[in-house]
Amino acid sequence: MKPSFLHIPAAALLLCSLWILPIYCCNKALCASDVSKCLIQELCQCRPTDGNCSCCKECMLCLGTLWDECCDCVGMCKPRNYSDTPPTSKSTVEELHEPIPSLFRALTEGDTQLNWNIVTFPVVEELSHHENLVSFLENVNQPQNVSVQVSHSNEKEHMCTVVYFDDCMSIHQCKVSCESMGASKYRWFHNACCECVGPECIDYGSKTVKCVNCMV
């Protein structure tokens, strides 16, 4: 019997073949990890466009909540035109359970030589861009269409501090990294830039990508 790892190059080749066109291609930053897993397990080998949907259910279950965003990566749905919606214009946000504000403040005080960039700005600026980007809330129990309000008397006193990691990372690694530094929330841009949001922030931090090695 051949070792199972020999299937990996074939899956990777198929993955790459689906990403040739830069405009009509899937969201690599968001989908790469899960798509690779499903292809390696050979759960998405059929082609609905050719009338063969024998694996559609298994493939959909494998991709889970990423099905809508990633089905085109495995040839299950029509390719989308991403030229009008670059990955940097979309992000996934989530509140973190049991944040540690004192830890976050300690790690973000003063200059650091670590692999992240600390950005501080007024809460007013944070809220002014509240609807600039499309964000997908991971927490399904969170109420939708919640309007964030801050009393005008205190707006000038509130400052929001966020941390951008220099390098690209998966959404799972982003969540784990932000939890480990005591952040209250995180924002993961679909180009794989990770932003940890501090306790003083009212919304989900900045909607601008500022990861020095992950800007595209």
Curated annotation (Swiss-Prot):
Function: Involved in dorsal-ventral patterning, permitting peak BMP signaling by antagonizing the residual anti-BMP activity of the cleavage products of chrd. Functions to promote the formation of ventral mesoderm by increasing the activity of bmp7 and other BMPS. Seems to antagonize BMP signaling by forming ternary complexes with chrd and BMPs, thereby preventing BMPs from binding to their receptors. In addition to the anti-BMP function, also has pro-BMP activity, partly mediated by cleavage and degradation of chrd, which releases BMPs from ternary complexes.
Note: Knockdown of tsg and bmp7 results in the siren phenotype with loss of posteroventral cell fates associated with decreased BMP activity.
Glycosylation sites: N52, N81, N145
Protein name, as recorded: Twisted gastrulation protein homolog 1-A
Entry domain remark: The N-terminal domain is sufficient to interact with bmp4.
A Gene Ontology term for the protein's cellular component: extracellular space
Keyword entries, A-Z: Developmental protein, Glycoprotein, Secreted, Signal
GO biological process: regulation of BMP signaling pathway
PANTHER family from the UniProt entry: TWISTED GASTRULATION PROTEIN HOMOLOG 1, TWISTED GASTRULATION PROTEIN HOMOLOG 1-A-RELATED
UniProt main location, coarse: secreted
Organism name: Xenopus laevis
Tissue specificity statement from the Swiss-Prot or TrEMBL entry: Posterior defects are induced by overexpression. This may arise through alteration of bmp4 or chrd function in the developing tailbud region.
